[in-house]
């Protein structure tokens, strides 16, 4: 249990283009479907989660006001079309989040501190994170109970996970790290072999794999989680199973 009273789950990877936003939006929808009160905080200046949830890309006062000494998260929270899911939208001002965090005392604890006052409002906070390792990443990691790391099975992904592990080794109380296989094509022998090898290195990896799917690719056009427009397809079933697996880890 995190200091906020809600479980804080970050969709995070050093590497870009691995499906972080896809994962965050669909996990939010599946969690809400089971009765979990969800806040999705979009921390990526590209604002893809904000777009997918049909929310205006606006941070009032910009990132500087958000993380200022008297900044509060509650005024930035917006409802969405998905029952049980609220969002803190992103805009392009978040590209300077590192700069504004660096101006604060205890910058690595700032995001966790912003979450504390809304402790009783949500069961789950999902952080949709930009790629890379930065001061903002460190603040995200300090706020999270667990990092779900979408990982396309390959040798490069193994290296990315190793880099993340090396970084976390230097922290006093690092979050759990749960690799999640993303954009998986089971027909590819190389991917199957990569998963088998990575599972040996990362025994806490989530068992459910998210398939490479045209239904997932439609999210940008539909501006919605997959389950809302294609409830019976393989990808929806995978996100549903993945959420069940994560929920069991968070609350048991």
Describe each region flagged by the PLM.
Residues 1-252:
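P-loop NTP-binding core
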């Amino acid at each position: 249990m995190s200091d906020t009273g809600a479980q804080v789950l970050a969709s995070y990877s050093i590497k870009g283009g691995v499906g972080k936003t896809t994962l965050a939006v669909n996990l939010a929808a599946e969690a809400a479907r089971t009765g979990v009160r969800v806040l999705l905080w979009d921390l990526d200046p590209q604002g893809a989660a904000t777009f997918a949830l049909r929310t205006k890309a606006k941070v009032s006062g910009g990132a500087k006001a958000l993380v200022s000494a008297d900044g509060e998260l509650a005024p930035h929270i917006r409802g969405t079309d998905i029952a049980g899911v609220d969002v803190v939208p992103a805009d392009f001002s978040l590209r300077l989040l590192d700069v504004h965090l660096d101006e604060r005392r205890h910058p690595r604890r700032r995001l966790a501190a912003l979450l504390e006052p809304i402790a009783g409002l949500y069961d789950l906070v999902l952080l949709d994170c930009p790629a890379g390792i930065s001061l903002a990443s460190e603040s995200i990691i300090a706020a999270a109970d667990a990092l779900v790391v979408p990982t396309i099975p390959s040798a490069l992904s193994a290296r990315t996970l190793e880099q993340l592990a090396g970084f976390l080794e230097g922290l006093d109380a690092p979050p759990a790290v749960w690799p999640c296989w993303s954009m998986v094509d089971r027909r590819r022998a190389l991917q199957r072999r990569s998963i088998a090898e990575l599972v040996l290195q990362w025994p806490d990896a989530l068992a459910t794999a998210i398939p490479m799917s045209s239904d997932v690719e439609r999210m940008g056009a539909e501006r919605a989680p997959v389950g809302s427009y294609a409830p019976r397809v393989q990808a929806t079933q995978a996100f549903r199973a993945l959420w069940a697996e994560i929920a069991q880890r968070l609350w048991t």
